[in-house]
Amino acid sequence: KSIEKTTALISMGIGKNWKFEEDFIAHQDIVVNAYDHSVRGFFWPKFFIKRFLSVLIGRLNAPYHAVKIYTKFMYFFRNKAVLFYEKIGAEEEGYTNLKKTLERIKEKPVFLKIDIEGYEYQILDEIILNSELLCGIVIEFHKISDHIDEIRSFINNFELELVHVHPNNNRIDDHDNPKAIEMSFARDPEKLSDRSVLPHPLDQLNVPRKKTVELKFIDS
């Protein structure tokens, strides 16, 4: 329902993976504004150098795949979405804040996708303040053991409802807990069942070659 209601997608954090944005507009033909300051300068030259050097260890198709990824990247962000080479964070730190990204969108409500490697904590208060403009959010929280209280406070104070939690299996701590988790929030979500099944059938491992991480819930 959140996807059906949204008029625009603001996507924070792209890198070399824009599958979420592709899938989103495949279901809903809307405006997409993406933000990532890192995909310029030496980002692509370093990417190509690594892929071409990987031929030396037998990955003969790596250069071809590198060119293919770059070509698709350029096509998507020239024809399907607008890419701002800006760093998201608190305005007082000189970064682009949430308010500015929302001002660039004429129609509301907006869906947010946030994966900005720890800077998400700088804009949590802004997300809460602008919650009436939002219909859904997917956000990845990093270094969660250091920010448990902030995450709990955000969940309790945000007017959208937490509908799904996905552990990122790329990195785990000494207690087999994920160092990052992905959370999905929706406005007025439709209840589908009285039972919650985790992992959800649509869940996918972030890194297929690594083991699945089980979520451990505690009383709030």
Model-flagged regions — what are they?
Residues 1-94, 107, 143:
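SAM cofactor-binding core of SAM-dependent methyltransferases
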Residues 8-10, 20-33, 43-46, 99-220:
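Conserved acidic-Pro-Pro-aromatic motif
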